[in-house]
Amino acid sequence: MITLSIRYRIDHNKLRDFEAYARSLTEPIRRCGGDLIGYFLPTRYAGPTNEALALINFPNLAAYEHYREALAKDPEGTASVAQVESSGCIVCEDRGFLQKIS
């Protein structure tokens, strides 16, 4: 099992746009083979207000590669990406993989 970690730097004035994006991808991610742990927004209590996180599990790297291909062809997924790009709420994103150890 591997976990895709996507760290987003977001425009903190557009949190609602990012939240709508995250909610719109729940079904496309599942449909395309990802096991969504969740999308996470910053709180007002501590830490940066312009960082968000997504965590998605896959059985292996081949499953992730299949997911990427399927998501690129998914009409709902591509519409969500187009909407978030036009909103400008994501400043940048970094992807990496994590392995659960306990």
Residue ranges and their predicted role:
Residues 42-48, 85-88:
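A short beta-turn/loop motif at secondary-structure boundaries
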Residues 1-2, 102:
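Absolute protein N-terminus
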Residues 49-51, 92:
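A structure-centric signal for secondary-structure junctions around beta-strands
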Residues 20-37, 57-95:
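An amphipathic, aromatic/His-enriched active-site/gating alpha helix that lines ligand/cofactor pockets
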Residues 2-8, 53:
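Active-site-flanking beta-strand signature of metal-NTP-handling nucleotidyl enzymes
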Residues 10-20:
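Short, surface-exposed ligand-recognition loops at beta-strand->loop->(often short) alpha-helix junctions
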Residues 8-12, 56-60:
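Short beta-strand-to-loop capping motifs
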Residues 97-100:
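Edge beta-strand at a domain terminus
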